[in-house]
Swiss-Prot record:
Membrane disposition: Single-pass membrane protein
Described purpose of this protein according to its UniProt entry: Nonribosomal peptide synthetase; part of the gene cluster that mediates the biosynthesis of the ergot alkaloids lentopeptins A and B. Within the pathway, lenC catalyzes the post-NRPS oxidative modification steps using as substrate the N-acyldiketopiperazine intermediate produced by the NRPS lenA. Lentopeptin A forms via a stereospecific hydroxylation, followed by a spontaneous bicyclic lactam core formation, while lentopeptin B is produced through an initial dehydrogenation, followed by a bicyclic lactam core formation and stereospecific hydration.
Enzyme class: oxidoreductase
UniProt name for this protein: Cytochrome P450 monooxygenase lenC
Subcellular location: Membrane
Keyword Metal-binding found: yes
Length: 528
């Protein structure tokens, strides 16, 4: 796979260092034997840098996974993909592995991972564990989940403000970008909770937060075009990496004054302000005596909350456009849920069972992906995330599972997501059935599994166990609020007759980001 990024000619000393390290890397690859794992589905002889393997993986990952799993006869063998050198295991092992401390989710997604997200490089610390701020981010998400009931109304205010400002009150049909609209809407609602009301509508802040993850993805692609041994050096010379660090500095200039005011309020003993992860995390870090970077922490909150959520929201919108017969039943459900005259209340969101079924069925067919660049064409470098393989781990020691399956120390592995097409679990699995999970609620055995936020081995979109996505509850609320406002206030339909093409890049499904819909204002039956 050719890189879309070009390395500018560096200073002579830097060039000499790079050339020397490159030669050492090539010699190491040629002279040091590699310990092969079984069933390297897309391994090619003399493919030193795995370029052919990456091409195979990019072109047909779904078929590679299916082919590999079909070869799993002996339980001690699992398929491996040369792209990144990791195992893909059937879902049946996920329950046993989910909380086993002999496997590390952190190392699988950071230092040891072939999908290296380069947390050790300046500007790249904000995703996943990070280096300085993880001790405040995860408790911050837990605190946010405890505040969900009080956060519904402020999030609803931001959804309403965004739609009125951007979709307007125009009663005539006009065009809106699905991707840009959903990202902007979710970004503003999330910012209200992350940095508070002072900054949540700031255009510069939104531009940074919406582009940071995309810029980071482009920078990662640029770095990974070079051998791993060069990563600690090469990032200093890449414009895309410098851009990431510039964005962090810009975000810091906006966040720091708010943080300083929050600290002054706290020092004076003023009454607590409305919840924000910015204020809560800072107080928590102070109380615990922990050092952290406030800007990187908030960038991580933002990266985690916007892109996956907005991607799924956009897919749900397009599925509803595909099935316009759903619009009126959904509206009736929303009116019934919010017909108390008290605006958006958290308990009302729990009544939206049809909406939740539509959300979960969409997620089953089109697992959420984190888009890192919007401009077309849609290419593998412009997407990140793992949609059809999930729950990555690395073995910290050699582990033998209960059925005799052995996972050697240092092995990186994830779990396939193929059972979402298992007809014994989901009748007619290839068909979009918006009522599927509503019917499941009526089955006493399966009722507890129908919830959108339920993490289970047969639906791995949110992972499983103690590393399951902690932000899924907030995502559930944001998507329901967004859909409620949109369905009540607007008519909408596809531009054209068919859904935009669903494409797969690596492990990720995504619609063409150029998808557009027509919208027009209508009179809502209830006020949120």
């Amino acid at each position: 796979m050719d890189s879309a990024f070009v390395l500018p000619h560096p200073a002579s000393m830097g060039a000499s260092c790079i050339l020397g390290l490159l030669l050492l890397t090539i010699l190491r690859a040629l002279l040091i034997p590699k310990k092969a794992l079984p069933l390297a589905i897309n391994h090619h002889r003399w493919d030193i840098f795995n370029r052919r393997a990456i091409q195979d993986f990019t072109a047909n990952p779904q078929d590679l996974i299916k082919a590999g799993l079909k070869k799993v006869i002996d339980p001690q063998i699992a398929p491996r993909f040369a792209k990144g050198t990791f195992l893909v295991l059937p879902e049946r092992y996920s329950e046993e592995v989910k909380n086993d401390e002999r496997f590390s989710a952190y190392e699988a997604l950071s230092r040891s991972s072939p999908q290296i997200i380069l947390l050790e490089l300046p500007g790249f610390e904000s995703v996943f564990e990070g280096l300085m701020h993880n001790d405040v981010v995860l408790p911050g998400v837990a605190a946010m989940n405890r505040q969900l009931a009080s956060l519904t109304s402020p999030m609803s205010e931001e959804v309403s403000h965004y739609l009125q400002t951007n979709w307007t009150d125009d009663p005539d049909w006009h065009t809106q970008s699905v991707s840009a609209s959903m990202s902007g809407l979710i970004g503003q609602a999330a910012a209200r909770i992350i940095v508070g009301p002072e900054l949540c509508r700031n255009k510069e802040y939104h531009a940074i937060t919406l582009s940071y993850t995309m810029s980071r993805g482009r920078a990662l692609a640029a770095i990974h075009a070079w051998p791993r041994a060069l990563h600690p050096l090469i990032h200093w010379f890449l414009p895309s990496c410098r851009n990431v660090r510039t964005q962090i500095r810009r975000a810091e200039k906006l966040i720091t004054p708010i943080l300083e005011r929050t600290r002054r309020h706290r020092a004076r003993g003023d009454p607590p302000q409305a919840f924000s992860t910015l204020a809560w995390s800072d107080e928590y870090a102070r109380a615990q005596g922990r050092s952290y970077n406030a800007t990187l922490a908030q960038m991580r909150f933002t990266s985690s909350s916007i892109h996956n959520t907005s991607d799924l929201l956009g897919k749900v919108m397009l599925r509803i456009c595909q099935r316009p017969d759903l619009i009126e039943p959904l509206r009736r459900e929303i009116v019934a849920a919010f017909d108390g005259g008290s605006g958006a209340q958290h308990h009302s969101l729990g009544k939206l069972k049809l909406m939740e079924s539509v959300m979960k069925e969409t997620q089953r067919l089109e697992p959420a992906a984190e888009r890192v660049s919007y401009p077309p064409p849609l290419t593998p470098e412009r997407l990140t995330g793992y949609s059809i393989v999930n729950m990555f781990r690395v073995a910290k020691e050699t582990v033998t599972l209960s059925d005799g399956t052995t996972i050697p120390k240092g092995t990186i592995f994830g779990f396939s997501y193929q059972n979402r097409f298992d007809p014994s679990m989901y009748p007619d699995p290839e068909t979009f059935d918006p009522y599927r999970f509503m019917r499941m609620r009526q089955d006493p055995v399966q009722a507890s599994l129908a919830s959108f936020t339920k993490a289970r081995s047969t639906h791995l979109s949110f992972g499983l166990g103690r590393h399951a996505c902690p932000g899924r509850f907030m995502a559930n609320d944001m998507i329901k609020l967004a859909l409620s406002h949109i369905l009540l206030k607007y008519d909408f339909k596809l531009v054209g007759e068919e859904l935009p093409k669903l494409e797969m890049h690596g492990f990720v499904y995504a619609r063409e980001p150029t998808a557009q819909i027509l919208v027009r204002r209508r009179q809502e039956e209830v006020v949120l």
